[in-house]
């Protein structure tokens, strides 16, 4: 068998061809090129016989299959005694999908592969921009980025997005980037890097798909965000705080000592959500995230697990529990999604039992309510207990059942004279109210929190009104306080 020689044509200027590339191209009886639309080819001697795969682009409707078809034909040509010389734009191992496929295929078929390097699009792009790659330049493919919903690189470092060769790709890339960058974020389009017609276009992110200059040699340079905002930067700060030269308080923390702070931050986050205060949400989400990353760093320091372990397990769980998104399961509404979710969780529990050598009938196996966190607020815990029990049919047949149970529990409280018994009956009443709320599709925890907020807000208005009138709350009658309360309610409803 012959040899497959892959030659890098460079970015476009014939003068950028390496000596080895020139000799390989000019000495071959024929040269196959991925595309004849490359400026370097015009600088080759007329004696070089060129064959292109442009017909594959024209006859293959699915662009994803183009490189597969080209690589297969190159492998067939390479199997001939004379082999084949295959030339590609730029460097053969930079953003060249066909070469990746050829490398795999050649190894499987026992073919010899020779790669002759070429100048990639990266070097002339950096020259046109006047920037250095060493501060952490990230290089990604525009087709891949456009297919995502969030960028696959972080925003503290610059990124070069290759192959933004059409307005459609630019639009897809723009929408993905806008999940991380502001619409007005400054970026640069680089057209024809490495050619005499190179052009650098500075514009805002939202404008990139409007450029009239986008063509097959267009790339996008994304500048870093002005503030440190990547997850990696946060991990570095927390790791520094926990380091020997870091903060004494952070260094002494353990999973157990941080429990109170995690709970406090969770409740402060809930308060921000109750207020629907966007600025407060942003701050409290950060404080809550701090607790998660700090716990992960404690685990790293103790050799327990890493943040990557946490994220990898979460990613796998999200994909596994959403087969209607990432698999072939159909879920046409939210109810079907919940059914699918519960089926997957049940399968996970069964798999865990098998791993532990247990069966569902094993008295030591995990019960239906065992996974409900014991530290949940009482209302939320009661609701979860009831939902779990309802899944196996332990529930009222209709809403009249829980409504009647509330009345029954009130009567039992009124019939009890013993304080301890009244306490138990009051608990049963609250549990029944939670069950009624569940049937009404009301979140009892949220409903009570909102009632608490309303009470506190209205009572503060009562205090202010009394102070404005020069009255002491302690000296006012209940009727006077009720009047101020009613006025506070009226003002609130009007607002």
Each PLM stretch: what is its role?
Residues 69-73, 124, 265-268:
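Well-ordered alpha-helical segments embedded in enzymatic catalytic cores
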Residues 1-116:
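Class I S-adenosyl-L-methionine
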Residues 262-270, 278-300, 304, 308-316, ...:
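An amphipathic alpha-helical micro-motif enriched in hydrophobic residues
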Residues 2-7, 23, 30-33, 79, ...:
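Beta-strand/loop-alpha-helix module characteristic of Rossmann-like adenine-cofactor folds
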């Amino acid at each position: 068998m012959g040899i497959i020689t892959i030659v890098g044509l460079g970015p476009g200027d014939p003068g950028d061809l390496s000596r080895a590339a020139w000799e390989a191209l000019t000495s071959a009886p024929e040269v196959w090129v991925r595309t004849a639309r490359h400026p370097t080819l015009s600088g080759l001697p007329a004696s070089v016989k060129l064959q292109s795969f442009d017909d594959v682009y024209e006859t293959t409707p699915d662009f994803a299959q183009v490189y597969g078809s080209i690589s297969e034909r190159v492998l067939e040509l390479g199997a001939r005694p004379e082999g084949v010389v295959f030339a590609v734009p730029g460097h053969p191992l930079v953003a060249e999908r066909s070469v990746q496929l050829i490398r795999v295929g050649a190894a499987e078929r026992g073919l010899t592969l020779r790669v002759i390097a070429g100048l990639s699009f990266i070097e002339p792009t950096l020259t046109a921009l006047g920037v250095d790659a060493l501060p952490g330049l990230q290089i990604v493919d525009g087709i891949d980025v456009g297919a995502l919903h969030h960028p696959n690189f972080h925003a503290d470092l610059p990124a070069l997005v290759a192959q933004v060769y059409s307005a459609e790709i630019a639009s897809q890339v723009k929408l993905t980037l806008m999940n991380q960058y502001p619409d007005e974020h400054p970026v640069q389009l680089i057209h024809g890097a490495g050619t005499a017609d190179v052009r650098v276009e500075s514009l805002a992110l939202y404008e990139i798909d409007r450029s009239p200059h986008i063509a097959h040699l267009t790339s996008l340079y994304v500048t870093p965000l002005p503030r440190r905002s990547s997850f990696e930067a946060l991990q570095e700060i927390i790791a520094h705080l926990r380091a020997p030269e870091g903060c004494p308080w952070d260094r002494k923390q353990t999973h157990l000592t941080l429990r109170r702070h995690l709970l406090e931050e969770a409740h402060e986050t809930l308060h921000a959500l109750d207020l629907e205060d966007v600025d407060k949400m942003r701050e409290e989400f950060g404080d809550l995230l701090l607790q998660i990353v700090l716990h992960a760093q404690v685990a790293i320091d103790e050799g327990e697990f890493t943040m990557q372990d946490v994220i990898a397990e979460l990613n796998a769980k999200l994909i596994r529990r959403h087969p209607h998104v990432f698999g072939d399961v159909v879920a046409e509404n939210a109810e079907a999604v919940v059914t699918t979710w519960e089926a997957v969780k049940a399968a996970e529990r069964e798999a865990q039992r098998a791993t532990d050598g247990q069966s569902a009938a094993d008295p030591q196996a995990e019960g239906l309510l065992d996974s409900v966190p014991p530290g949940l607020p009482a209302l939320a815990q009661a609701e979860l207990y009831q939902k779990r029990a309802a899944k196996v049919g332990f529930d009222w047949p209709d809403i009249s059942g829980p409504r009647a149970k509330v009345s029954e529990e009130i009567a039992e409280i009124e019939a009890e004279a013993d304080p301890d018994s009244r306490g138990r009956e009051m608990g049963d009443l609250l549990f029944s109210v939670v069950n009624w709320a569940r049937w009404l599709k009301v979140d009892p925890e949220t409903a009570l929190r909102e009632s608490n907020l309303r009470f506190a807000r209205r009572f503060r208005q009562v205090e202010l009104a009394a102070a404005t009138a020069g009255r002491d709350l302690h000296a006012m009658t209940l009727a006077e306080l009720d009047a101020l309360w009613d006025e506070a309610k009226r003002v609130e409803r009007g607002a």
